[in-house]
Amino acid sequence: MPKMKTKSSAKKRFKVTATGKVIGGQAGKRHGMIKRTKKFIRDARGTTVLSEPDAKIIKGFMPYDR
């Protein structure tokens, strides 16, 4: 059976930690930030840990990154 391929888009956007959690950028920052609160903009910086259902999907995209 051939090897599974890693989705290159997922490889560029997400990282799996040593404990198995998936880290990715915060969503919802592309446009429309003028109506957001300063707290929302501040909290949306950096990265966040994905929820378990989302992390399971991303781990399926990266079979060798567990």
Curated annotation (Swiss-Prot):
SUPFAM superfamilies registered for this protein in UniProt: L35p-like
Q: Give one GO molecular function term.
A: structural constituent of ribosome
Mention any one GO cellular component term assigned to this protein in its UniProt record.
cytosolic large ribosomal subunit
Q: Which PROSITE patterns match?
A: RIBOSOMAL_L35 (PS00936)
Q: Does the keyword Ribosomal protein apply?
A: yes
Q: Which Pfam families match?
A: Ribosomal_L35p
Alphabetized Gene3D superfamilies for the sequence: 4.10.410.60
Disulfide-bond pairs as recorded:
none
Keyword list (alphabetical) reads: Ribonucleoprotein, Ribosomal protein
Q: Which GO biological process entries does UniProt record here?
A: translation
- Entry similarity comment: Belongs to the bacterial ribosomal protein bL35 family.
- Supply the source organism for this entry: Roseobacter denitrificans (strain ATCC 33942 / OCh 114)
What this protein is called in its record is: Large ribosomal subunit protein bL35
Q: Which PANTHER family match?
A: 54S RIBOSOMAL PROTEIN BL35M (PTHR33343), LARGE RIBOSOMAL SUBUNIT PROTEIN BL35M (PTHR33343:SF1)
